[in-house]
Amino acid sequence: MKMKLLMTSVLSTSLFLVACGGGSSDDGPATTNPSGTPTNNIQNPVVKVEAYTSTNLGSVAAESSILTYKMLGQSGQEVQATSLVFTPNTPPPVGGWPIVVWAHGTTGVADVCAPSKAALADSTKDLISKLLAAGYVVVAPDYEGLGTPGIHPFLNVKSEAFSITDAVVATRNYLSQRNLLTSKKWVTVGHSQGGHAALGAAQYASRAQLEYK
C-alpha cells in the first residue's frame, strides 16, 4: 500500500498555548545532521494498554487504546509517555498495516491537556477516521510529560521526535504480541506544535530503525 495521505507536515508560523495553560520553549537549535541519534533498544517498551472510550471510532476502528510506553526523555533517561493507538477494522494487507503518526497541535503543558484524556476534536476525528478507512494504523502520541510524570518540554524537538519514534516502536511491539502485522513503513503528519514534532520525527527517524517515508 502506498503512502498517499498527508505526506506534508505543516509547521505553523505562530504557536500559542491555549486553554490548559502557558509554557515556554527550552529547545536549542535543531541540528541538521543527526548522525549521533541513538537507536531505540528499549526492552519491553509497552508498560500497559487501556481502552480509549472518549471518542467512538467503532465503525472504522477495530481497537482504540491508550498505550503507556517507555521512551528516551529529554534528560537522556528512560521515562514513560502515553499515546493513542487506533487499528483499522480491516485485516492487515500483505506486509502489514503501514503506520501514520498524528502529531497533535498545541494543547497546553498540564497533564490534563494530554489528548488521550479527552474526546478528539471533530477535525481530528475525521482525519483519523479517513486514515483508518484507508488501512493505516494511527498512532497519536501525547508527547513527553503530557499526562505522565515530569515536565512537558514544550517545543523541544528531540523530545517531540523521540515521543513519536518510540511510540511507533512500542505500538509495533504491542500489535505483534497480538499477532497483528504492521509494516516497517511509517510517516508523521501534524500541525502547529505537531508540525514541529513531525519535522523532528523526520530528522530523527533513524532511531526507530524502520522505513520512514
Predicted regions and their residues:
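Active-site glycine-rich loops that stabilize anionic/oxyanionic intermediates
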Residues: 72-74, 104-109
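Alpha/beta-hydrolase active-site loop
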Residues: 154-177
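Cap/lid segment of the alpha/beta-hydrolase catalytic domain
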Residues: 107-162
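Bacterial N-terminal signal peptides that target proteins for export
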Residues: 1-9
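Primarily recognizes the serine-hydrolase "nucleophile elbow" in alpha/beta-hydrolase
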Residues: 170-213
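Short beta-strand element of the alpha/beta-hydrolase
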Residues: 82, 95-107
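Catalytic-loop region of hydrolases
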Residues: 21-92
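C-terminal motif of bacterial Sec signal peptides marking the signal peptidase cleavage site
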Residues: 16-19
